[in-house]
């Protein structure tokens, strides 16, 4: 599995601001969107383009456009919604697919309660977005759901991740690419990433 830790200075600066314990909901939300925008730039560098001829101000001109069915953005509810606008700022024509998961309190594994995928998934590149990749359970379930639709090009965009989750995904789905702003140290006993961001969903939605 290809893992890209994007160490761009702007990303690292913005992520540092997000780690502040007293960061406001407004600022945290804006920063999540900004980092998502920068991660999208990195994750789409290999998109195929094709030449088309358009009418420019001085006559016909050949330009490049993205080839094929393009992209579907897949936020994992609810925290993934906090990154969606940042991705769509970069790819405004992208279709949005949605996955909703909850945790089974007995098995502690994610269970899908909602899914809505764009048409033609077998021809699309799926960008899964979620602020945190912790145990990898939610991502694993989402990847499996996407592959059942026929989607074969899948990438994940995360603000923070830990080695345990990355290793789990790598074993199960070595074909998936991961783009992450920071690979953090570890999970604590409660399953939170350290140093992490705290509960990113609560911070994005103001329910902390």
Curated annotation (Swiss-Prot):
Glycosyltransferase in keyword set: yes
Pathway it works in: Pyrimidine metabolism; UMP biosynthesis via salvage pathway; UMP from uracil: step 1/1
A biological process term (GO) from this entry: uracil salvage
Residues noted as binding 5-phospho-alpha-D-ribose 1-diphosphate in the record, renumbered to the chain: 78, 103, 130-138, 199
UniProt remark on cofactor binding: Binds 1 Mg(2+) ion per subunit. The magnesium is bound as Mg-PRPP.
Reaction it catalyzes: UMP + diphosphate = 5-phospho-alpha-D-ribose 1-diphosphate + uracil
UniProt keyword terms in alphabetical order: Allosteric enzyme, Glycosyltransferase, GTP-binding, Magnesium, Nucleotide-binding, Transferase
Record EC number: 2.4.2.9
GO molecular function annotations of the record: GTP binding; magnesium ion binding; uracil phosphoribosyltransferase activity
Entry similarity comment: Belongs to the UPRTase family.
HAMAP family: Upp_B (MF_01218_B)
Name by which UniProt lists this protein: Uracil phosphoribosyltransferase
Organism listed in the record: Pelobacter propionicus (strain DSM 2379 / NBRC 103807 / OttBd1)
């Amino acid at each position: 599995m290809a893992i890209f830790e994007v160490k761009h200075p702007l990303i690292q600066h913005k992520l540092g601001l997000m780690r502040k314990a007293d960061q406001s909901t407004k600022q945290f939300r804006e920063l999540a969107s900004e980092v998502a925008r920068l991660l999208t730039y990195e994750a789409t560098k290999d998109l195929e383009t094709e030449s088309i001829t358009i009418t420019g101000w001085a006559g016909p001109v050949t330009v490049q456009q993205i080839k094929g069915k393009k992209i579907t953005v897949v936020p994992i509810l609810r925290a993934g919604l906090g990154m969606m606008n940042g991705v769509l700022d970069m790819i405004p024509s992208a279709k949005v697919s949605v996955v909703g998961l909850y945790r089974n309190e007995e098995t502690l594994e994610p269970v899908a309660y909602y899914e809505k995928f764009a048409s033609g998934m077998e021809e699309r590149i799926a960008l899964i977005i979620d602020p945190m990749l912790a145990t990898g359970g939610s991502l694993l379930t989402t990847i499996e759901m996407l592959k059942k639709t026929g989607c074969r090009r899948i990438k994940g965009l995360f603000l923070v991740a830990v080695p345990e989750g990355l290793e789990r995904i790598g074993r199960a789905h070595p074909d998936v690419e991961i783009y992450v702003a920071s690979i953090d140290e570890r999970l604590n006993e409660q399953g939170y990433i350290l140093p992490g961001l705290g509960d990113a969903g609560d911070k994005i939605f103001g329910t902390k």
